[in-house]
């Protein structure tokens, strides 16, 4: 069974970082680079992402867009204080995807696992801080 996203379990408890102007700027850069790439490739979002994840597609505008993704990931990692984390961007197989379509331009599987572990730990720390401040009433412990 694959991973699932449910807002109540994922988004509402996600340990977010504080808003940073640099992330806003990179988000705008990503939006513009993606729009420009869609215009140059004459494709919509879905087909653009197929090109991004295809290592045979090496047009300059795709390389630029991939670099914006790398920059965004690096800045988010830094915002969490994880300067030590090696993201290892490249074309990697993603085991959760269908066998005939597993390659994505993304961070390595090891980096992905490490990020999930760090986010889990951070979520627990923040929750404990909230418990200590009395924000959750009586907390039940799991047996």
Where do the protein language model's features map onto the residues?
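S-adenosyl-L-methionine
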Residues: 1-143
